[in-house]
Design a protein with these regions (language model features):
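Residues forming the flavin
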Residues: 1-253
Length: 253
């Protein structure tokens, strides 16, 4: 279907993570992590995530889990407003006093003195608006690359050898990385056993891909992102949003 720039796999309930299948390993030892896993399990994820080394929910299950989590937030006094876009930040002497919000044809002011701006990397118009309003911002490193796909049977054989033929082992995954003397790193990311590659553009005329697996990970193919780290000094445009504009340029090629 035609891309809807307001409603796509980068935005909406659960955000881009909903369609990146719920890999819940962070690589940290924060004690809050186990509590987070318990909330996912209580919301319908497989309880095995509580002890798996690489907990995974699956896109098909996650679609329901995020709805349950939303209802839990509402029960605790939270409010969720779908289709309400923050179009500006109200500032007084450099301090936040509210948010300008647009819903359909109406615009209103939402008073507040604290904002957690969790907008991911695809709400580029919001970044531009904040910069134009004088909100302090600085460029940061990010990773960019491609997504590769190959038969899951190939990965199983590579990782398990003859044992892959028994049918007793789960779909195999892998992780590759290299660190060069100049500080550059290339590595695989978001490896999806038995998964699929999905279109993930959020702007017209651009090509972006993501990967996902359902809970069973029983697809015939595997995929992974192969990315390289980029520092602000690598960006052709040295402005605050230079990295973002470079992303946009590459996505349009």
């Amino acid at each position: 279907g035609k891309l809807d720039m307001r409603r796509n796999v980068q935005f909406g309930e659960g955000g881009a993570g909903t369609f990146s299948d719920g890999k819940l390993n962070t690589g940290t030892k924060n004690p809050r992590g186990q509590w987070v896993l318990s909330q996912f399990a209580a919301a319908g994820a497989n309880p095995e995530i509580l002890y798996d080394a690489k907990p995974h929910v699956g896109t098909d299950v996650l679609l329901t889990v995020v709805q349950v989590l939303r209802q839990r937030i509402i029960e605790l006094g939270g409010e969720v407003r779908f289709g309400h876009q923050v179009t500006a930040v109200s500032l007084t002497q450099g301090r936040v006093t509210g948010l300008e919000v647009t819903h359909e044809a109406d615009t209103y002011l939402l008073p507040c003195d604290r904002v957690i701006l969790a907008i991911g990397h695809s709400a580029r118009d919001t970044f531009e608006t904040l910069l134009a309003q004088g909100v302090p911002m600085e460029p940061k490193p990010f990773s960019m690359g491609v997504r590769v796909e190959h038969p899951q049977a190939l990965i199983d054989e590579s990782q398990y050898g003859e044992a892959a033929k028994t049918g007793l082992l789960p779909p195999a995954d892998y992780k590759l990385n290299v660190h060069l003397p100049d500080g550059t790193s290339a590595y695989t990311f978001c490896m999806c056993p038995g998964g699929q590659v999905v279109a993930a553009a959020s702007e017209e005329g651009r090509v972006v891909t993501n990967g996902m697996s359902n809970a069973a990970r029983d697809g015939k193919n595997a995929n992974a992102a192969v990315v390289v780290t980029l520092q602000p000094e690598d960006f052709p445009d040295k402005s605050t949003l230079g990295g973002m504009y470079w992303q946009r340029e590459i996505e349009a090629r």
